[in-house]
Amino acid sequence: MVKSFIPLAVAMLFAGAPLFACEYPPADGVKIADGATATEAEMLESQQAVNAYRRKMEAFVDCLGREIEALEEPTVEARQMRNLRHNAAVGAMEDMAERFNVQVRKYRARLEQ
């Protein structure tokens, strides 16, 4: 068993697979409460979910950086792919923050009435 594992491990090492497995965090589990009707507890729960998503996305972006740094000589294509993935992650975080902030403004406007 061990003898068959060693050649497989060596083959995988030189197969060109990325050293890090940077997985894009899904946003589908993040629920943002409707600020027009939400309670304070629901808004705080939404804030916690958005912050948790942001932390996961920041870890993803950090992983992308480590992944490209691990390559001895990254190709132009590898750098471009890293930049695309990085920019998509930043855009997703900005979109999530804006969606949450819209609901916060609705919530605060409702409280001021």
Please name every model-derived segment:
Residues 21-22, 75:
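Generic structural signal for short, solvent-exposed loop/turn connectors between secondary structure elements
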Residues 22-37:
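Short N-terminal segments immediately surrounding and downstream of signal-peptide cleavage
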Residues 33-113:
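Surface-exposed, polar/charged faces of alpha-helical domains
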